[in-house]
Swiss-Prot record:
(2R)-2-phosphoglycerate binds at Q162, K335, R364, S365, K386. Binds a second Mg(2+) ion via substrate during catalysis. GO terms for molecular function: magnesium ion binding; phosphopyruvate hydratase activity. This is Enolase. InterPro entries: Enolase, Enolase-like_C_sf, Enolase-like_N, Enolase_C, Enolase_CS, Enolase_N. Its main location: cytoplasm. SMART domains: Enolase_C, Enolase_N. HAMAP family: Enolase. It is an enzyme of class 4 (lyase). It comes from Rhodococcus erythropolis (strain PR4 / NBRC 100887). Catalyzes the reversible conversion of 2-phosphoglycerate (2-PG) into phosphoenolpyruvate (PEP). It is essential for the degradation of carbohydrates via glycolysis.
Amino acid sequence: MASIEQVGAREILDSRGNPTVEVEVLLEDGSFARAAVPSGASTGEHEAVELRDGGARYGGKGVEKAVEAVLGEIAPAIIGIDATEQRTVDQALLDADGTPDKSRLGANALLGASLAVARAAAESSGLELFRYVGGPNAHVLPVPMMNILNGGAHADTGVDVQEFMVAPIGAPSFKESLRWGAEVYHSLKSVLKEKGLSTGLGDEGGFAPDVAGTKEALDLITIAVNKTGLKLGTDVALALDVAATEFYTDGTGYKFEGKNRTAAEMAAFYAELIDAYPLVSIEDPLDEDDWDGWVALTDQIGNKVQLVGDDLFVTNPERLEEGIVKGAANALLVKVNQIGTLTETLDAVDLAHRNGYKTMMSHRSGETEDTTIADLAVAVGSGQIKTGAPARSERVAKYNQLLRIEENLGDAARYAGEVAFPRFAFEA
C-alpha cells in the first residue's frame, strides 16, 4: 500500500543563504522521499504567497511558521491518502489552506509536501520521477536556456535586463548542448577579462559585469560564441528575461536604460533587437498587468520570437486562460512555487500546450540541490528549461540530472533542439 504514513519538515538554506522549506514523506510500504522549495528574487504580484516568519531571525526570512504548518496541519490532512493519487493529495492541501493565494499555510509549505509526495510515489512505483509523472511516452530532453550574463534584480549593476541566455539549439543531444553552453560560458569569462570587466557572479551563476546596456551585453555574448567556433543563430541562439515589472511604474511607464518609455517604445526596441541578433525568446518584456501592451506586442512581433509570460501568468491556469483569450504572449514560464502544487502546475502546462503555447520549465534565483524541475521538464515535454549558468552546484544539479535522464532513455531520448521554439527571428 502506498498510503502516506509520516510527514516531516525542516528549515534549510537556499543558494542565497536564505531559509527555505524541506519536506519529507514516508509511505506505508517504506518508500521515502524529500523535496526542497525554491524562492524567487523578482516575484510576480499574482504569485502564491510564501510564508515567512518576520522578526529579527534571518532578517525576517525564517520559515519556522511554514515548517509548523507542515507538521501541524498539512501532515494530518494528507496522512492516510494513497500517494499515487496526486490530485487527491493536492486537493487536500488546498482545502487545508483554504485561501486563494495559499497565504494561510504558505505556498512553500504546500509545495514541499506536494513534491515530496510525488517523489515518494515514484519511489514506491519503482519509476524515475520523469517517467512516473510523464508516463511511457516522456522522452524529450529540453534545450537548456543558460543564463550566462546577469543584470536586473539578480545583480548589483546598471544593466536593466535581468537575464541574457544562450540556447544551444543546434546540438545533437542534451549532453552536447551542455558542453556547448559551458564552453560559451568560459569563453565569455575570458572576453570579460580581456575587456577589463568584472567576472563576479550573479545569483544564478552568470557573470555580472557593469556594461552600458542591453546591446553591449549581447555584443559581448556574440564575441564569446564566435570565439568557441560555434555558429551564432544555427548552433547557439540568444534569449532574454527582461523582468520588465521590476522597472515599471504606474504613471511614468518603463524606466529603461535611462529613459522613461511607453509599451509601444519598448516594443520598438525589441523589434530592433530581433532584427539585429538571433533572439528566439524574450521573457516578461512588459509589466505583469500591462495586458494591452502585451497584446499589441504579441501582435507586432509574436510571429518572429517566443514571448514568454512569467510574472504575467505566474503558472496560474486562470491568468493563463485570460492571456489565451486576449492573445497575450505565446509561451508560459513554469515555476512550481508560483502556484504551489504539482497538480496545478501540470494543469497550467496542459492548458498551455492545448492552446498552442510553448512552455519553459524554470528554477528560481534562490535554489537548492533539489532536481525535481529537471524531471518535470522531460515529463511534460516542455522542450525548454531555464536553470541558470553551467556553474554553481544548485544550478548544475539540474543539468546533471538531465544527463542521467538522457542516459536512462538511451536510444529513445530525443533532444528538442530548434523545434522547441515556435519560430525564429534570425536566419544564418
